[in-house]
């Protein structure tokens, strides 16, 4: 399951960041200065909807919940896996440019910089990236009652077809080992979200990585 999510979001990140490659420091001195300053990542205006909740079904008994506010500047992703003999729930709180991840019932988690892609609209990527990942615009399609943009791409040996609405993933189909693995929204709720869900949990220590 983690491989599926990695494949989609890695491709999304690469495409979204493709236009900023030329802004990287060209010299070692410039690189050092940038590292020392360590600016906090800025995450804003990622989605075309201010706030909401989306529930997903995924392979291997996996369910996911996405809570977001301030147009995606802060969000919480809860991933629950039920294999019958074992159950796990991981929570990822993303806000203020950082991602805080921990597993339910544990007292330690991790904190790292959150460099979220500003867009999942592949058509906005530069031509070289579009060619490298064989990105194709497949038009639009109604998924879960939403008019979604549809794209196909290839990340490594895993072809991906994705549907997004207001820059939010609604469905993805990843082909791995000849089988289709589907992540799809089952319920979409527009509207306000309880701000408490974005609070860091008491009793959990986050180690920065």
Can you annotate each of these PLM segments?
Residues 1-15:
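Sec-dependent bacterial lipoprotein signal peptides
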Residues 15-16, 55:
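Residues marking helix boundaries in flexible regions
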Residues 24-25, 33-209:
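Extended soluble regions of mature proteins
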Residues 17-25:
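Bacterial lipoprotein signal-peptidase II cleavage site
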